[in-house]
């Protein structure tokens, strides 16, 4: 206006101004100089003194300029006008007191009228408005009505005010229409000064233009009036403001409500408002975005007033310069600061218009001076960009607003009006939301938010560059909140402006008495009003069809929800506020989401196109979490809960609700586990035990450790199904699989990996953790990264920061209670004053992933808008997104699509890291930063004792927990610092402190809270987990002195046992009846989640009462989870229509899982009735899927539980299992069906008449069934023939085997036993070798029942042997050609099975002839034994030998009969056959061994057959001998009884002995011949049995494939008294230690000989068994005949034809006819006659008589080897033809070593098996190992396993046990001629010392098969006895009905074995044999996995082969004869002379 020139002498100019002689223009010029150069104080004084001069100068010049303007109107005149108006303004400003007294009233009024004339240009009119407002400010109450009318007309567009003269407009006020007489004086007409010029820019909306000007000038001119009394400045503003309210507000806000008061708020929830009519007005030039508006009157004015009012609360505080990027901390010139401010302002404005700001640029923008004011609308020149010079004006304005209640109410009401705007005005709403956000989040509250009793004194002179708050605490909310003490650069500081100077405070204290002046309403009132008012945004009907507006609406709603969430988590609220919050959330949820089914279907699949679809997830989440949080803090009434129930149950068609509910329940279950059961679900005792075991035994520690750390980081998600280090897609655990419906929903989350930040930024190369995942990332580790660096991230991150975070978690685990910083306006939900861990937990969930830079940036809801077109951008970037994606960050996606119970994004691992935080305590000496110490859950104590009360016990009813729902509410209060100080020791409860408290050292952060920036608007999906968590240091109660929780009517807030229980129960039912859910998919999803929920409850139950140290068993838990609580829903679900099939299947599954567990509390009668009804209907259901589900999930334990009345379902189960077995689908539960059937085979003999539900009638009808057995066996037989699944076929065969044994034991003579045997026998040649092997095992087991078979099925044993022979004959050719070891192993098994059967039958039976049906032409009869040797011959020498009819044993067709069909059709399997070689985990880790295997394979069958042959030759008819079954082979060695050897073992001195020689026979057998002294002194004569014999005996020791045998032989001369001629000499060969075979023990009674019933009397038989002599022969008897009969009886091996005595004539030879036979007889008779005649004729001839000979004198042999040589000669060993097969052995030490080694090898298969006894309540190894006895049933069982042997003298297999009694005195032992089993029985072994316990554990633990007899009510766990072995566990559980349930646990690589299977139920009579057989088969299966494993006979054969190869001595005949004649130089026995 004026160019400033240096005028030194202001005084001169002053004088010239006052010089009246000067002309007006000169005086004006000097006046300007004075104004420009004088100090303001002097200027005020000058004007006061010379006001009339000054006004005169001004007025004169104004008149002049006015005249010249009218004439010329050039630009120069306009500039002069500006200059003179400058003087006018100075007059108004400097002389307010005079103007107030109406000085120059009319003159000034006239000038202003000229300026305000509507004909002027807009610039002049606007200037006029400004000056008019100055004048009015000075006049205040002294103005006239005319001025007020003018004020009311300043803004065009408003209705004219009414007066007595009619409506007043600005025109008629400036030029009043006076009806005067012509003669009267008239006023000069006021005309425009400067009319609009042609180039002037017009304004479209004059109303807005002038309204903005008016509002602006009202404020910025407040302080420009130089009042002597400064209070008048405030009064001036108040005057203008009050009239503005009076004249304009009623039009701008027609529905303004004056009753609304912050002090008596009206808290009625508003109604839904209909959608306004939106009109498109234009398209944005830059973004091409359509802009909409509504045609409501004054809508723009409303927006302007709101924005104007908001600006006072969002203005930057004093001295806070604009943030210029890169210039932080520097002092800049003001002009640069201003430029920067406007630049940033423009930049932001542009960004806002184009789109919402790029997140990475946010830090600069959000700190700038104008950032909060210029949004969306282009910032017009002046309105909101008020610079810092005017901040003082703003302070005054703010003071006025805060001066009295009416003004505070005005602000509140205008903000309410903002929430009522249409959504096209969202920008204004955002500002109001921002204001509320700051009010709520900042520490320093506005005065009216302070509590009424607060003094609110705050320091007013803190320099702004200092810390935000240096330990000065503002008292707020009745709590002391400690300020954070981090420093920060000045541009980040927001100092409070409403408590800045002392006078301001004092002013309030002065007026405090008056109610109007007492404006402190308290935080709660503001929160309540905000909650109510902000709900209007939700309650506006959305414009779903207009995408831009929908985006805006969504954004606004999310901003509000973010604040709600912040309040829920961080703000302390009273009961009323909580109730208000809940009511509003309820109403909002209901209003937004409730829609008709038609409307809902219309948007199905297009949810993102509607507001409801976009908000469903966040709304449900916020509502549920707020509800839980409220219950933790205050008592919530029953009515409110009922409302919640009615609302949520009416919204179940939202999938998001189901998912949110499931997440809530999942976390609540963790809370319940922690608070009620003291378990951490992510760190369960059983998991720990198995992990320790894995680390200890398997060497997998390192990898596992890492996994564990990764998982354990998050308590809330500790059992997430994958490790965070992997890809972001989470996998579901094997234990829980989702239904198709939910898997689809869950899979969506996998695609939602684009987050809000990375859409516009960089390609996603690196991925950074969301800050919600780990609260401590902004620490020194990452501090070096530049703050603005943009880093994209994904919402399902599995981030690069993970390892660091884990480390930080470890470091900070002690820092459980740092004070979190308060959130200022930019601070987000990331870090906040977290009242306790639960809040932190919610906060965690409220915010998933809000940081996009690696420095610690917070994320406050609201400091940033989401770009409106974000969905489009996202869709462009990620075409794979699902169609229903709302296009907002994944945290906003519907929970159903953003993760569910099964599929978690990886951030779920850390989503509740902070779950262990509690409220910041008051630590005086520490300043806390923003990083939060996060202990990993592995470090959390479990110290939370049981809160046990009667109401928490489970009772036997449908509802298992009784808690009064009236008193149920959960609470976890935001603990104040004071409270926290009281309990700061962390010994919150006695229980907890006893477990050890935790250090509380805080870890200060390197970043202050000022760095925490809002990055985006995410509502965290993890909200739940935060709400629901329990801190480890606020475990039970923070107030030990107080008694009960808020919920129970007490004062304790937070989680407690009762709270967790009631909350869990209520939330479980909050969806109402889940069966009322209409959408089948959602219904299925809910039931799928119920299955998972139940699994967690079951997991809790399984982990209760677990011994931690494995040394003591804890007592049974007092509280147990209510596992049956879900059954009413499940029962009802089964009755739904087929539309809900998936849900029904889940329900059936869960019913079965629930009821097949051991029931802690027995179900009551009503329950069981209902349950059985449902099972009855389900098992007979027409839908096979339902049947399959029940069978799958009931098997195998259903019948083993002994539920009362469970047998009522037997018929149903048999029918259903039969249906499954006969169905064509391979994926049906076939194995389960067979297991169920197999578990029933022993039942019919127990229940002869079984009452059961009738399966053919759907109604309930009980019938008595006697044909259950037939039905079961029919089904099992059918399955054993036709079952297409291999494993199921194996189980069916095992069931058949068990059933046959059961029937034999019960002597039922069941006709189908033969058919069952037929099926088993036919299965021997089945193509699948696993099945054939199982069949072979069944036959093997039946060997133990041979005696019973012989009685009840006398033909069967022989038939089985014949079938085995024929089957081997049938299989051998193909097996020899096969390259698969499995094929060969099968034939070997069949050979060994055949051997056992042969040994089990008496010789008579084996010698019976085979009646072949197929060979009529073959008249020769072969005995069974003959066929056996033929088939063995074929196996040794190859199947080609069968081509010779002489060597062919028997064919299958020969065996066909009525009882046996050898070619019965068996259906082949429909699944791939398993690999022939059972390569397991063990065998697969081998070095290449294929060549060795091939050699072994080739000889497998041959060597097995040779073993069988030698075994039969040695033992058939002999075993067991007098030494008992434990003695199979001789213990005698060459040094025993040898007078030439004094050594106790084989030693080289034997080679010097002349009485011993070593031979090899047939290259397979080692023979030692020793000559020893006879035993004359023995009673009965010893070996010679009293007969005359030589003085030396011969001992032959034979070592062959089947063992070592010793035979002693003596030469017999005759009876003791010789009468007549001497008897011819003969040799008797007998066994060394016994005279004749003795009967075996009773267990081998099958070996007893059965007498031949040939009609002879007993006497006659006895007679036959004595040697016939002349004295005993009667006259009519023939001596030779009797002798032949005697020989046949006593030595049956001498019989030429089996069973036919030697004295019976041979049958007629085939080649001789009857005539020829008669001729021969006649010839013989003729010769007899001739001889008789000759004797009679020549009897007395002398030459026919001979003299009597004397007996020769015996000669004593001189050779020590004489008798051996003699015996060898008699046996023909010295003959030429034997020369090739009889050789000498080299005598050397190696031979002795080899012999000793050979003798140490086992000659039978050996097994050692552990047996444990577990008594009731025993859960640890110590209790189990110290049992010294068991129940009677157990002892009977152990007795049945074998017979008790005395270990001190036991000569059989010892299995490592000691003879010195250190491992016990006796133990059960079982043996046959082929197998030895010793049982390591824990109760038989001493446990009286630690050493004996260790020894006991070593013996038992090293066994690979464990038999466990458990009488405990809980299932036995594998890890109780810690061992690396124990690969197979056979657990026996006695049942109430005296049957026994079998559980088999085996490692996965172990192949199938029988006869018992997992789930079998057997009778006590067959139990011991079954278990023993199963254990032996399990042991064999385990050995089959050992690489290069050799059977005992293979090993022995190899040793023999080695000895023969290396030690056979080839010799000439002469050398051989010499060595046989004299093995060594002869020398005398020491005592030889006596002989």
Curated annotation (Swiss-Prot):
<protein>
    <recommendedName>
        <fullName>Ral GTPase-activating protein subunit alpha-1</fullName>
    </recommendedName>
</protein>
<feature type="region of interest" description="Disordered">
    <location>
        <begin position="848"/>
        <end position="911"/>
    </location>
</feature>
<feature type="region of interest" description="Minimal domain that binds to TCF3/E12">
    <location>
        <begin position="1326"/>
        <end position="2035"/>
    </location>
</feature>
<keyword id="KW-0963">Cytoplasm</keyword>
<feature type="modified residue" description="Phosphoserine">
    <location>
        <position position="720"/>
    </location>
</feature>
<dbReference type="InterPro" id="IPR016024">
    <property type="entry name" value="ARM-type_fold"/>
</dbReference>
<dbReference type="InterPro" id="IPR046859">
    <property type="entry name" value="RGPA/RALGAPB_N"/>
</dbReference>
<dbReference type="Pfam" id="PF20412">
    <property type="entry name" value="RALGAPB_N"/>
</dbReference>
<feature type="modified residue" description="Phosphoserine">
    <location>
        <position position="772"/>
    </location>
</feature>
<dbReference type="InterPro" id="IPR000331">
    <property type="entry name" value="Rap/Ran_GAP_dom"/>
</dbReference>
<feature type="modified residue" description="Phosphothreonine">
    <location>
        <position position="1001"/>
    </location>
</feature>
<feature type="compositionally biased region" description="Polar residues">
    <location>
        <begin position="849"/>
        <end position="862"/>
    </location>
</feature>
<feature type="modified residue" description="Phosphoserine">
    <location>
        <position position="710"/>
    </location>
</feature>
<keyword id="KW-0175">Coiled coil</keyword>
<feature type="modified residue" description="Phosphoserine">
    <location>
        <position position="860"/>
    </location>
</feature>
<feature type="coiled-coil region">
    <location>
        <begin position="1713"/>
        <end position="1748"/>
    </location>
</feature>
<feature type="compositionally biased region" description="Polar residues">
    <location>
        <begin position="986"/>
        <end position="1008"/>
    </location>
</feature>
<feature type="compositionally biased region" description="Polar residues">
    <location>
        <begin position="366"/>
        <end position="384"/>
    </location>
</feature>
<dbReference type="GO" id="GO:0005096">
    <property type="term" value="F:GTPase activator activity"/>
</dbReference>
<feature type="region of interest" description="Disordered">
    <location>
        <begin position="714"/>
        <end position="752"/>
    </location>
</feature>
<feature type="modified residue" description="Phosphoserine">
    <location>
        <position position="993"/>
    </location>
</feature>
<comment type="subunit">
    <text>Component of the heterodimeric RalGAP1 complex with RALGAPB. Heterodimerization is required for activity. Interacts with the HLH region of TCF3/isoform E12.</text>
</comment>
<feature type="modified residue" description="Phosphoserine">
    <location>
        <position position="859"/>
    </location>
</feature>
<dbReference type="GO" id="GO:0000122">
    <property type="term" value="P:negative regulation of transcription by RNA polymerase II"/>
</dbReference>
<dbReference type="GO" id="GO:0090630">
    <property type="term" value="P:activation of GTPase activity"/>
</dbReference>
<feature type="compositionally biased region" description="Polar residues">
    <location>
        <begin position="486"/>
        <end position="496"/>
    </location>
</feature>
<feature type="region of interest" description="Disordered">
    <location>
        <begin position="343"/>
        <end position="384"/>
    </location>
</feature>
<feature type="modified residue" description="Phosphothreonine">
    <location>
        <position position="753"/>
    </location>
</feature>
<keyword id="KW-0343">GTPase activation</keyword>
<dbReference type="Pfam" id="PF02145">
    <property type="entry name" value="Rap_GAP"/>
</dbReference>
<feature type="modified residue" description="Phosphoserine">
    <location>
        <position position="999"/>
    </location>
</feature>
<feature type="domain" description="Rap-GAP">
    <location>
        <begin position="1795"/>
        <end position="2003"/>
    </location>
</feature>
<feature type="compositionally biased region" description="Low complexity">
    <location>
        <begin position="894"/>
        <end position="911"/>
    </location>
</feature>
<feature type="modified residue" description="Phosphoserine">
    <location>
        <position position="863"/>
    </location>
</feature>
<dbReference type="GO" id="GO:0005737">
    <property type="term" value="C:cytoplasm"/>
</dbReference>
<feature type="compositionally biased region" description="Basic and acidic residues">
    <location>
        <begin position="345"/>
        <end position="365"/>
    </location>
</feature>
<dbReference type="InterPro" id="IPR035974">
    <property type="entry name" value="Rap/Ran-GAP_sf"/>
</dbReference>
<feature type="modified residue" description="Phosphoserine">
    <location>
        <position position="989"/>
    </location>
</feature>
<feature type="modified residue" description="Phosphoserine">
    <location>
        <position position="985"/>
    </location>
</feature>
<comment type="function">
    <text>Catalytic subunit of the heterodimeric RalGAP1 complex which acts as a GTPase activator for the Ras-like small GTPases RALA and RALB. May interact with the HLH region of TCF3/isoform E12.</text>
</comment>
<dbReference type="InterPro" id="IPR027107">
    <property type="entry name" value="Tuberin/Ral-act_asu"/>
</dbReference>
<dbReference type="GO" id="GO:0005634">
    <property type="term" value="C:nucleus"/>
</dbReference>
């Amino acid at each position: 206006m004026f160019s400033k020139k240096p005028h030194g002498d202001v005084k001169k100019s002053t004088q010239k101004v006052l010089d009246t002689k000067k002309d007006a223009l000169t005086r004006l010029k000097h006046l300007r100089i004075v104004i420009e150069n004088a100090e303001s104080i002097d200027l005020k004084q000058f004007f006061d003194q010379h006001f009339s001069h000054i006004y005169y100068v001004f007025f004169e010049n104004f008149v002049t300029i006015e005249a010249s303007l009218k004439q010329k109107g050039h630009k120069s005149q306009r500039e002069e006008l500006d200059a003179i108006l400058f003087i006018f303004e100075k007059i108004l400003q400097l002389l307010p007191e005079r103007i107030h007294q109406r000085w120059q009233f009319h003159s000034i009024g006239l000038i202003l009228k000229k300026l305000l004339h509507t004909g002027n240009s807009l610039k002049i009119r606007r200037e006029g408005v400004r000056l008019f407002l100055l004048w009015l400010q000075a006049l205040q109450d002294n103005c006239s009505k005319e001025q007020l009318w003018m004020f009311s007309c300043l803004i065009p567009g408003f209705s004219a005010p009414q007066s007595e003269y009619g409506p007043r407009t600005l025109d008629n006020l400036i030029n009043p229409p006076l009806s005067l007489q012509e003669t009267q004086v008239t006023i000069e007409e006021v005309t425009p000064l400067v009319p609009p010029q042609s180039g002037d820019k017009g304004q479209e909306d004059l109303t807005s233009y002038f309204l903005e000007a008016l509002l602006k000038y009202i404020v910025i001119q407040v302080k420009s009036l130089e009042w002597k009394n400064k209070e008048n400045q405030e009064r001036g503003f108040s005057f203008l403001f009050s009239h503005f309210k009076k004249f304009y507000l009623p039009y701008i806000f027609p529905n303004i409500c004056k009753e609304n008061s912050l002090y008596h708020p009206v808290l009625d929830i508003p109604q839904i408002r209909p959608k306004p009519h939106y009109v498109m007005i234009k398209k944005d030039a830059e973004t091409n975005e359509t802009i909409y508006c509504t045609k409501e009157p004054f809508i723009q004015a409303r927006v302007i007033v709101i924005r104007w009012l908001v600006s006072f609360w969002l203005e930057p505080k004093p001295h806070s310069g604009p943030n210029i990027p890169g210039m932080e901390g520097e002092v800049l010139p003001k002009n640069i600061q201003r430029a920067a401010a406007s630049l940033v302002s423009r930049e932001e404005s542009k960004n806002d218009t184009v789109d919402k700001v790029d997140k990475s640029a946010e830090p600069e923008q959000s700190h700038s001076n104008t950032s909060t004011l210029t949004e969306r609308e282009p910032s017009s020149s002046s309105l909101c960009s008020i610079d810092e010079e005017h901040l003082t004006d703003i302070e005054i304005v703010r003071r006025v607003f805060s001066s009295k209640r009416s003004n505070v109410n005005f602000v509140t009401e205008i903000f309410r009006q903002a929430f009522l705007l249409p959504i096209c005005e969202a920008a204004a709403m955002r500002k109001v939301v921002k204001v509320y956000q700051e009010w709520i989040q900042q520490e320093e509250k506005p005065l009216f938010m302070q509590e009424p009793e607060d003094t609110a004194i705050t320091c007013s002179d803190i320099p702004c560059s200092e810390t935000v708050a240096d330990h000065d605490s503002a008292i707020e909310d009745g709590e002391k909140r400690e300020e954070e003490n981090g420093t920060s650069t000045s541009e980040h500081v927001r100092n409070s402006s409403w408590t800045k100077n002392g006078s301001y405070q004092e002013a309030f204290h002065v007026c405090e008495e008056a109610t109007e002046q007492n404006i402190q309403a308290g935080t709660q009132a503001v929160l309540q009003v905000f909650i109510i008012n902000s709900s209007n945004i939700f309650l506006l009907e959305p414009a779903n069809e207009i995408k831009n507006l929908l985006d805006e609406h969504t954004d606004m709603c999310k901003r509000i929800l973010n604040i709600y969430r912040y309040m829920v988590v961080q703000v302390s609220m009273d009961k009323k506020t909580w109730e208000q919050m809940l009511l509003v959330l309820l109403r909002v949820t209901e209003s937004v989401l409730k829609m008709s089914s038609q409307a809902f279907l219309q948007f199905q699949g297009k949810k993102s196109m509607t507001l409801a679809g976009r908000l469903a997830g966040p709304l449900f989440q916020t509502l549920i979490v707020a509800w839980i949080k409220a219950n933790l803090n205050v008592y919530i009434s029953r009515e409110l809960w009922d409302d919640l129930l009615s609302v949520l149950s009416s919204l179940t068609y939202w999938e998001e609700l189901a998912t949110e509910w499931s997440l809530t329940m999942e976390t609540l279950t963790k809370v319940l586990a922690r608070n009620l059961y003291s378990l951490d679900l992510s760190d369960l005792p059983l998991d720990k035990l198995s992990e320790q075991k894995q680390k200890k035994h398997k060497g997998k520690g390192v990898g596992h450790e890492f996994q564990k750390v990764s998982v354990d980081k998050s308590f809330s998600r500790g059992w997430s199904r994958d490790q965070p280090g992997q890809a972001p897609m989470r996998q579901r655990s094997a234990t829980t699989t989702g239904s198709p419906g939910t898997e689809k929903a869950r899979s969506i989350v996998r695609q939602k990996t684009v987050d809000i930040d990375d859409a516009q930024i960089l390609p996603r190369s690196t991925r950074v953790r969301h800050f919600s995942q780990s609260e401590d990332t902004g620490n020194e580790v990452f501090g070096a990264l530049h703050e603005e660096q943009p880093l994209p991230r994904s919402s399902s991150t599995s981030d690069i920061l993970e390892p660091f975070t884990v480390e930080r978690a470890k470091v900070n685990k002690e820092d459980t209670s740092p004070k979190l910083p308060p959130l200022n306006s930019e601070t987000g939900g990331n870090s906040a004053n977290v009242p306790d861990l639960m809040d932190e937990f919610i906060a965690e969930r409220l915010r998933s992933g809000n940081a996009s830079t690696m420095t610690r940036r917070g994320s406050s809801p609201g400091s940033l808008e989401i770009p409106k077109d974000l969905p489009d951008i996202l869709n462009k970037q990620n075409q794979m997104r699902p169609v229903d994606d709302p296009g907002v960050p994944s945290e906003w996606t519907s929970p159903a699509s953003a993760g569910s119970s099964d599929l978690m994004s990886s951030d779920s691992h850390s989503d509740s890291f902070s779950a262990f935080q509690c409220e910041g305590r008051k630590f005086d000496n520490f300043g806390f930063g923003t990083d939060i110490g996060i202990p990993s859950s592995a470090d959390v104590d479990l110290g939370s004792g049981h809160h046990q009360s009667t109401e928490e016990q489970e009772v036997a009813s449908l509802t298992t927990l009784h808690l009064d729902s009236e008193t149920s509410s959960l609470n976890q209060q935001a603990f104040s610092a004071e409270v926290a100080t009281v309990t700061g020791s962390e010994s919150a409860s006695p229980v907890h402190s006893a477990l050890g408290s935790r250090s509380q050292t805080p870890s200060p952060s390197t970043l202050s809270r000022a760095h925490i920036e809002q990055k985006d608007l995410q509502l965290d999906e993890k909200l739940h987990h935060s709400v629901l968590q329990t801190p480890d240091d606020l475990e039970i109660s923070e107030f030990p002195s107080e008694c009960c929780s808020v919920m129970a009517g007490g004062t304790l807030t937070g989680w407690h046992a009762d709270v967790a229980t009631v909350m869990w129960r209520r939330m479980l039912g909050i969806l109402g009846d889940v069966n009322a859910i209409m959408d089948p998919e959602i219904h299925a999803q809910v039931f799928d989640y119920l299955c998972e929920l139940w699994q967690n409850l079951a997991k809790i139950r399984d982990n209760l009462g677990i011994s931690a140290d494995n040394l003591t068993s804890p007592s049974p838990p007092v509280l147990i989870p209510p596992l049956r609580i879900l059954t009413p829903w499940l029962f009802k679900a089964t009755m739904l229509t087929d539309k809900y099939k998936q849900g029904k299947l889940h329900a059936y599954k869960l019913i079965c899982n629930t009821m097949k567990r051991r029931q802690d509390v027995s179900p009551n009668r009503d329950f069981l009735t209902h349950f059985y009804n449902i099972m009855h209907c389900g098992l007979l259901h027409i839908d096979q899927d339902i049947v399959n589900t029940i069978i799958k999930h009931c098997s195998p334990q259903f019948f083993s539980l002994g539920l009362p009345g469970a047998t009522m379902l037997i018929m149903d189960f048999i029918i259903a299992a039969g249906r499954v077995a006969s169905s064509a689908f391979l994926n049906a539960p076939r194995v389960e069906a067979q297991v169920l059937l197999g578990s029933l085979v022993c039942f019919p003999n127990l229940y002869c008449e079984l009452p059961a539900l009738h399966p053919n009638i759907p109604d309930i009808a009980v019938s008595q069934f006697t044909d259950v057995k037939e039905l079961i066996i029919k089904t099992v037989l059918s399955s054993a023939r036709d079952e297409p699944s291999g494993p199921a076929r194996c189980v069916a065969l095992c069931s058949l085997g068990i059933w046959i044994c059961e029937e034999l034991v019960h002597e039922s003579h069941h006709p189908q036993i033969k058919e069952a045997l037929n099926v088993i026998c036919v299965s021997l040649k089945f193509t699948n070798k696993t099945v054939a092997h199982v069949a072979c095992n069944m036959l093997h087991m039946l060997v133990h029942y041979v005696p019973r078979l012989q009685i009840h099925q006398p033909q069967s044993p022989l038939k089985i042997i014949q079938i085995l022979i024929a089957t081997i004959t049938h299989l051998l050719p193909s097996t020899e050609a096969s390259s698969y070891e499995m094929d060969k192993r099968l034939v070997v098994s069949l050979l060994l099975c055949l051997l056992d059967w042969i040994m089990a039958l008496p010789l008579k039976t084996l010698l019976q002839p085979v009646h072949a049906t197929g060979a009529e032409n073959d008249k020769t009869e072969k005995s069974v034994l003959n066929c056996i040797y033929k088939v063995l011959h074929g196996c040794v020498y190859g199947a080609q030998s069968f081509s010779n009819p002489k060597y062919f044993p028997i064919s299958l067709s020969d065996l066909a009969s009525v009882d046996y069909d050898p070619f019965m059709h068996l259906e082949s399997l429909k699944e791939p056959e398993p690999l022939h070689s059972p390569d397991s985990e063990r065998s697969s880790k081998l070095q290449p061994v294929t060549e060795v295997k091939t050699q072994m394979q080739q000889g497998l069958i041959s060597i097995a057959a040779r073993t069988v042959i030698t075994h039969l030759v040695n033992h058939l008819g002999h075993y067991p001998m007098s030494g008992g079954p434990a003695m199979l082979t001789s213990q005698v060695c060459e040094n025993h009884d040898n007078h030439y050897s004094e050594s106790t073992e084989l030693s080289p001195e034997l080679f010097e002995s002349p009485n011993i020689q070593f031979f090899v026979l047939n290259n397979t057998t080692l023979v030692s011949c020793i000559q020893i002294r006879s035993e004359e002194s023995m009673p009965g004569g010893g070996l010679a049995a009293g007969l005359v014999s030589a003085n030396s005996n011969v001992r032959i020791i034979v070592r062959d494939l089947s063992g070592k045998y010793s035979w002693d032989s003596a030469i017999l001369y005759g009876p003791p008294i010789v009468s007549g001629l001497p008897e011819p000499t003969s040799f008797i060969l007998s066994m060394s230690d016994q005279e004749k075979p003795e009967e075996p023990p009773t267990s081998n009674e099958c070996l007893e000989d059965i007498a031949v019933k040939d009609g002879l009397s007993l006497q006659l038989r006895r007679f036959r068994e004595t040697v016939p002599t002349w004295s005993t022969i009667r006259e009519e008897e023939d001596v030779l005949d009797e002798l032949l009969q005697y020989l046949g009886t006593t030595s049956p091996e001498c019989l030429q034809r089996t069973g036919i005595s030697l004295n019976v004539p041979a049958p007629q030879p085939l080649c001789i006819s009857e005539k020829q036979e008669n001729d021969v007889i006649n010839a013989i008779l003729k010769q007899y006659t001739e001889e008789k005649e000759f004797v009679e004729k020549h009897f007395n001839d002398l030459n026919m008589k001979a003299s009597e000979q004397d007996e020769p004198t015996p000669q004593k042999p001189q050779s020590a080897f004489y008798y051996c040589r003699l015996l060898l000669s008699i046996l023909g060993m010295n003959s030429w033809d034997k020369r090739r097969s009889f050789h000498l052995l080299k005598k050397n030490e190696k031979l002795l070593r080899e012999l000793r080694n050979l003798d140490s090898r086992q000659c039978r298969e050996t097994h050692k098996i552990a047996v444990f006894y577990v008594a009731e309540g025993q859960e640890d190894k110590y209790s189990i190992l110290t049992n010294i006895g068991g129940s009677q049933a157990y002892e009977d069982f152990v007795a049945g396993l074998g017979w008790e042997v005395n270990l001190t003298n036991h000569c059989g297999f010892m299995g490592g046990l000691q003879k010195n009694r250190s491992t016990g005195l006796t133990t059960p032992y079982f043996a046959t001629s082929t197998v030895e089993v010793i049982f390591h029985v824990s109760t038989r072994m001493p446990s009286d010392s630690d050493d004996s316990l260790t020894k006991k554990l070593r013996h038992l633990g090293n066994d690979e098969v464990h038999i466990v007899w458990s009488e405990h009510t809980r299932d036995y766990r594998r890890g109780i006895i810690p061992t690396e072995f124990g690969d197979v566990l056979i657990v026996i559980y006695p049942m109430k009905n005296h049957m026994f349930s079998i559980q088999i646990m085996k490692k996965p690589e172990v192949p199938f074995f029988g006869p018992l299977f997992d789930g079998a139920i057997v009778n006590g009579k067959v139990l011991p044999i079954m278990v023993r057989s199963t254990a032996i088969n399990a042991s064999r299966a385990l050995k089959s996995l050992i690489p290069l494993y050799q059977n005992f006979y293979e090993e022995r054969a190899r040793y023999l082969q080695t000895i023969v190869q290396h030690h056979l001595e080839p010799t000439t005949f002469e050398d051989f004869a010499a060595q046989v004649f004299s093995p060594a130089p002869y020398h005398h026995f020491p005592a030889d002379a006596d002989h």
